[in-house]
Amino acid sequence: MFMSTDEVRRAFLSFFESKGHQIVESSSLVPANDPTLLFTNAGMNQFKDCFLGLEKRAYTRATTAQRCVRAGGKHNDLENVGFTARHHTFFEMLGNFSFGDYFKEDAIQYAWEFLTDVLQLPKERLLVTVYETDDEAFDIWNKKVGIPADRIIRIGDKKGGKKFDSDNFWQMGDTGPCGPCTEIFYDHGDHIWGGPPGSPEEDGDRFIEIWNNVFMQFNRHADGTMEPLPKPSVDTGMGIERISAIMQGVHSNYEIDVFQTLIKAAADAIGYQDLTNQSLRVVADHIRSCAFLIVDGVMPSNEGRGYVLRRIIRRAVRHGNKLGAQGAFFHKLVGPLAEVMGTAGVELKKQQALVEKVLRIEEENFGRTLDRGMSILNDALDQLSGQVLDGETVFKLYDTYGFPADLTNDVARERGFSIDEAGFEQAMEEQRQRAREAGQFGTDYNSLIKSATNTEFCGYTASRGQSVVREMFVEGAEVSTLSAGDKAIIVLDNTPFYAESGGQCGDTGVLKTDAGIFHVEDTQKLGNAIAHHGVLAQGVLATGDQVDAIVDEKRRAAISLNHSATHLLHAALRKVLGEHVAQKGSLVRAETLRFDFSHLEAMTAAEIKEVERLVNQEVRRNHSIETNIMNIDEAKAKGAMALFGEKYDDQVRVLSMGDFSTELCGGIHASNTGDIGLFKIISEGGIAAGIRRIEAVTGEGALDYLDAQQAQHDAKVSEMAAKAKLLEKEIQQLKDKLAAKESAGLINQVKQIAGVNVLVAQLNGADNKALRGMVDDLKNQLSSGIIMLGNVAEGKVGLIAGVTNDLTNKVKAGELVNMVALQVGGKGGGRPDMAQAGGTDAHALPSALESVDAWIAERL
């Protein structure tokens, strides 16, 4: 029976749903609240706290089709990808899980029923393994299922290894939950080399593991003793690629429908026809991990997860280049991938444009140095006397041309060489943080604290309450008392303090008793407990004490305004920019809010203004902010926005603001949108390819921001006015100097009329103030005389006349200037010794000035 990969996925989930399992969406490839993991690499990752007893959900049975990535860190399949039949950077793990519900018998029966009844696999093709001492599992397979004893293989501990070091014994760590597992293998037939598990030929490809059932039934202590768990659990996993290969009658995973579609698409994009080439397999595999990592918010960078993504992209580009790709090709595979992934590709389709742009930009950037880097690498290999390429060359390729070391190793291996990894690491020195596991993926200090408390949160309706101290921790160790000055984590039986979640920061405040005061500086989740981080400011505190838990109300109120505004902002962005906008992160504090979202380009000033207008419009409408608890499917049916990759319980809290915004949210919010008062965007910018960030303020913070902006504006205006005044003064000084210089030249134009000094002249471009200064200067130089100056500036006529005091009884300056003004379309007057006028007819000025001599002569 042939089944497509999507049909296998749907059949698996439907089968276990019929067995009472909750279908849980695949979690993000970026593990939530687990700093020990680079990427989600197994179906059980999102249920880790459930298995540890730190988290309780509304269901005890679950089933998933989990997206996984193994590339970098401990689980690194990168160098084998494309060269074997079953290694991938990205894969899907089908799984069914029991959290203290059913155990071995049901798990085994379910697996067998699905394989033989639903998928109709031939029973004779299946064999199973159990841990050597797990008689219970052996008997279930043999007596309940009916598998002959010779097809049930007991697998013991590895030779030379520790006890329980076996392929059929699972353990989370040196201590903690662990237990035996049973694996189901499929026999591809004797035409393929290989032996059954446990045989010398087990590494062959004839018998392929398709399903692993892990039975968590013990808690291992540090001394090695095994204590039975009170509620044993089940964790199973079946790789969809392997089972799809069987259902499609092929042996290699790369022959299934998903990969064949991608291989053909890659061949078309590159212009290469041989579909069996291993480089096409590499490209087909890598587009899956790259695309879904970007969907889950990872962007190419030089550190942490972003650097792993960059390495995978560049490895794919190099293999495309090897096949003769001209120009960018990798991003062209996103569309075919979204289609062939079926029900698992819905979110990829929504973000297709973003994923394509990120890949294209990264590919183009690397393409600028790829050819040069390959030339240097090939030259170095050509000149190599031994078999190992030195670390300095590997580092140069990394540092200068962006070649990850594993890419260089790929090329070297293809030519029969290896690289000096130790030398490369030495050359890296301080830059080594860019490598596989960035420093942030280190010790999970919270794992040192195992809280048995399930804290009840009562902060939606109250900001203070009575609580009992259940547990206290100092530096990871549980203590029973605290003294003044101790920095500690306190767990209460119930609390009004909100623990950081969903981008909203944790509450602060105090825990008070008659004997002590504990300042809460932060609040975080600790499994099902809520951890109050802070310091005992005074007195003492002991486990069992009753405390007054008091939240800083003013700070919380400011946070709630910003959180509610974030929801309005999200909705407004989708209305203004489009439905492709998806939240990629947020930080809600008392002072500001920060919102990261998917968008391909910078927002225009008009778009920012429109988003602000929409948000403030909804603020003024003063919607009641309503919360309702409902089933998640019902919430989605009502149009509630859920954050992709976020983990939700079956019952969710739906927050609505009129008909403008409906989202799933567990945070603290205002009562009405009007409480926000005012919303103001203070910045918008890019933080990664296709990811934008808005920072904004609300309420008093917005008013403070606007006041500060106004103060800055006023200060700038005052500063500019002072500068303008200074410039005006400097300009006038320059004009005065220029006038003085011109007046010195005019003195040579003085003529005698009836024995009196007379100066008549036309200037251009001077202002009246300069003309007056010029006349005063000329009068001083002449001692006795009559001066008439005309000036044309910006098409208008300016006139000024000056008469020394000894001549004003004969010629008056006011009469003189008025006579000239009448000829140029104006009039004027003034004192006998100084007068000015204006006119509009600049063309008449020369003839008007020519009439001055005769007019003066008549009066002398």
UniProtKB/Swiss-Prot annotation:
Reaction catalysed by this chain?
tRNA(Ala) + L-alanine + ATP = L-alanyl-tRNA(Ala) + AMP + diphosphate
What is its cofactor? Zn(2+)
**Family matches, as Pfam families:** DHHA1, tRNA-synt_2c, tRNA_SAD
Q: Name one GO biological process term.
A: negative regulation of DNA-templated transcription
Name a GO CC annotation attached to this entry: cytosol
UniProt xrefs under PANTHER family:
ALANINE--TRNA LIGASE, CYTOPLASMIC, ALANYL-TRNA SYNTHETASE
Q: What is the protein's given name?
A: Alanine--tRNA ligase
Q: Which organism is it from?
A: Vibrio cholerae serotype O1 (strain ATCC 39541 / Classical Ogawa 395 / O395)
